[in-house]
Amino acid sequence: MRLIADSGSTKTHWVLLNGEQELHCVTEGLNPWMADRGVFALVGRQLCGQLGLEGARVEQVFFYGAGCGTESACQRVREWIGETLPFDSMEVNSDLLGACRATCGSREGMVGILGTGSNMCYYNGQRVALQRVSTGFILGDEGSGNHIGKRLLKDYLEERMPEDLRAMFHDDYPYTTAEFIDCIYRRPFPNRFLASLASFAASHKENQYMQEVIHSCSRAYFEQMTYFGEHASLPLHVVGGLVSSFEAEIGEAAAGSGVRLGVMVQSPIEGLVSFHKE
């Protein structure tokens, strides 16, 4: 049995390969910088129940996750998953390498992620060969769901959002200013909370103000292409939840920034299954 996981900060998509059988399930996200040992244990038990793995031992686990850019983070993932799911071997890599393998296979390319967070790299066909430093949802994550959510919430609280949208935003999120601040600075997973606000942008994306917000955040993302020098002329393959919500807007911002887009998919899991079946 082989188990493949694509884990963002919000959700994890699992696929169990057992002979010709292919079983899928979705659990909570397992970013080792945001989720603790208890969350990993809970997800492990859910996973065993949903995939019928109680008492079983998985031969190989391939885990691609947000927050898995350092060896210490990867070690935590191996250790914490191993406490509830026995395995013979486990390979933990970043979600960015997962996006690369899913879209490029063994070919070179530029690859990006636009989901709860964001990232971008040059992939040489074997590894992530060039990548900007990922500074997380407070300092970075340009173009991501939490970037859009952060912009909306700031405009709402500072009364810069148009009145009609502000009223609708309040209907959807009837919180006081203090409650919003509490969600960001005191409660767990503030990045998920901010990213959840991007659904409001998706519901009202025909609005001129909302178009400006989406395009502004997307342009900030594509401005990062200049870091990659000659590689920036390659098509950029994009993976992530924002692809389904803002595909047209992302395409327009890319064209306006002189960026050629390649494959655009919401989830890399099917590409990863194909990669590991080869």
Briefly describe each language-model feature range:
Residues 1-58, 103-108, 153-278:
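ATP-binding/phosphotransfer module of carbohydrate and carboxylate kinases, centering on a glycine-rich
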Residues 15, 75, 118-131, 246-255:
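Acidic-glycine-rich active-site phosphate/pyrophosphate-binding loop
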Residues 49-91, 103-104, 183-187:
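Short beta-strand-loop/turn "lid" adjacent to the catalytic site in phosphate-handling enzymes
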Residues 62-69, 114-117, 233-243:
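Glycine-rich beta-strand-to-loop/alpha-helix junction loops that act as flexible
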Residues 81-83, 128-136, 253-260:
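Glycine/charged-rich beta-loop-alpha catalytic/anionic-binding loops adjacent to active sites
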Residues 86-95, 140, 261-264:
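Short, acidic/small-residue loops that bind anionic groups at enzyme active sites
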Residues 88-112:
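Conserved phosphate-binding catalytic cores of ATP/NTP-utilizing and phosphoryl-transfer enzymes
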Residues 107-157:
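Glycine-rich phosphate-binding loop of actin/hexokinase-like ATP-binding domains
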